[in-house]
Amino acid sequence: VPASYGLEGLYRVSSAGTLVDLYLQSGSRTLELKPYGISSVATDRTMTPIVSNDFDAEGGLDVKYNLPKGLTADFTYNTDFAQVEADDEQVNLTRFNLVFPEKREFFLEGQGLFEFGGPERLLWGRPSNAPSVFFSRKIGLDSGHEIPLNLGGRLTGRLGKYTIGALNIQTGSANDIGVKSTNFSVVRLRRDILRRSTVGIIGTHRSVNLAGTGTNEVFGADASLAFLQNLSLTGFWVRSRTPGREGRDYSYRGRLENLGDRYGIEYEHLVVGEDFNPEIGFVRRRDFRRNYMQLQFTPRPTTPLIRKLRNELSFDYITTLDGRLESRQLRYLLAPEFQNGDEWWLEYNKDFEFLSTPFEIATDVVLPRGPYASESIYSAYHLGPQRPVNGWVGFIRGSFFGGTRTQIKYFGRIELSPILSVEPRISIDWINLPQGRFTSKLVIGSFNYTISPRSFFSALAQYNTSTESFSTNIRFRWEYEPGSDLFVVYTEGRQTDDRGFPILQNRGFVVKFTRLLRF
């Protein structure tokens, strides 16, 4: 399957082939060394003093050692992620923080072993309200700035019925943005019980908290119990410890699911205290109690057109811990799946939001404190992944914070050939509020070309009016030996708030060379 398909390649069975002359490394080799060398030229006009065509060269080392009984130890020195693809831009029309997925290889490996709470991932654009105790992007990144990773180690694997994950990272300081050298530690342990169930614990430690007043620790326990064929019960309890943030420094959740092919029900009770502060995790919102229920009915009509007809009715009710209503949503979804693999979504939402403080939704557009009720219709058509042109197109229309909102979206993939594809993504919001009118535009274009089974070229261009930015990211990768790579990366960011050609903010050119040695 060509690398240009990305994750969608998992579902492209028609493009699969037969492996011949496959060379497998000897399983007796327990030690892998991967040194790297990198040279770069960078310009950054947002720094003081301005950095212009600054040349740098350095190296580092990754080590992997396969221990007996299914455990793996990883060590990293002077870790570098220059070859990682840039984050996809997002538009935020809520008062809560956005979450960006992890893309760095070191943290992606074994990521599932450390999951607790959350998940932080998005489902069809709907963010989870559950906090994540460990969110790896809190290590080595601060407000978009890279922090040096000096040294790190990780232990992962299974010992009988136990799944083990331990991580320790020492980061350097970044005096220009006021970040101190910090040690991050995470320990995660799960045990299998019954047939398909687990119980576990987690602990995290940050040697210097964000306020610089001491340390930050988090301790928690969770369970996932599976009964019968579709019934499951999950839950967690977790508490943080930060100087000056005592009191409601806890979070807990209980969730019941019974999701069959025809009928389904979900119920969740979630609490996050106002002082809960996992500084190696991610919290979208604090000081709330959530009760959520969803009913699902999915018949399979005996018609030549429709494969199944999904009906979902959900109710989301969120209050502060003192009982004041903050958010409420009634949602109904009708989603027929057609025999050709296409889907059509038609969704009705009735929402209520209470703003406890004024909210600046856009530049010079501030929503006053108070209650806001709204209704909206969402319609989207999803083309099946087997089509040369696939993806989905969506439309939203309805009331919004005392005004109106109209949105159109297209996220797609155009397969020009088995080795060449283009992925356009367009999102435009027209917002009309009593406090002002504005239009938010997000345009992303991705180009992927598979040169050979061991090399590819990709380009990403993004334009976002919300952040007044235009950015590009161009990457070339050549795997000249199994596990050994050459990367060439060019990145550029420009500001678009002034008329005329976008003003250069930063630019970088990187060449990175890695060599895998097995013993």
Where is each model-derived feature located?
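Outer-membrane beta-barrel channel domains
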Residues: 1-24, 29-43, 51-307, 348-354, ...
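Short, surface-exposed beta-strand/loop "edge" segments at domain boundaries and coil↔beta transitions
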Residues: 44-45, 321
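Membrane-interacting alpha-helical segments
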Residues: 46-47, 432
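Exposed, low-structure sequence patches enriched in small/polar residues
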Residues: 148, 236-519
